[in-house]
Amino acid sequence: RRFANGLPANNALLWGARGTGKSSLVKAIHTEINGDIAGALILIEVHREDIPSLPLLLMYLRDQKNRFLLFCDDLSFDAKDDSYKSLKAILEGGIEGRPENVLFYATSNRRHLMARDMIENERSTAIHSSEAVEEKVSLSDRFGLWLGFHNCDQNTYFAIVERYADYYGLKME
């Protein structure tokens, strides 16, 4: 809401177990904000394969009057993929800086966006293993907001929903 109203906001990484509603939450936020202020936020889905072309998109969006939420669903990287470096530069703002009218939200099953075995392999094979690992893990640090979605059983889920319903005064049947 802050971002849609022209105020600064953080890029966000929603990470956690599959099927816990990460993508649904991003889409619901977009719908909610546009329900309050029609057209306040334009959602653009970005595929991982499109990350290298993001600088061109940002250059175009920079001059637009609208606010944009770039959304990459199920983001992760494998050992042979170095496009995470491009994303890191984009999240940091690069030389030109991230446009004030653009935010980046991503969902992932991985907190650090890299497979654990990929990170551990860097530890075992690199000359300066801690530096190599830090470079790969630091991508997730570029997101100002991290939201973790943890698995829970059905009873715990129902308890969470009931507490929220009570808090917001919602009637449940």
List each model region and its residues.
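C-terminal alpha-helical "lid" subdomain
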Residues: 150-173
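Conserved AAA+ ATPase "SRH/arginine-finger" region at the nucleotide-binding site
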Residues: 108, 124-137, 144-158
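Conserved nucleotide-binding/hydrolysis micro-motifs of P-loop NTPases
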Residues: 49-52, 75-78, 104-114, 151-157
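Conserved catalytic/switch belt of AAA+ P-loop NTPases
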Residues: 34-35, 59-63, 78-125
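Walker A/P-loop nucleotide-binding motif
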Residues: 6-27
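AAA+/P-loop NTPase substrate/partner-engagement loops
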Residues: 32-68, 76-80
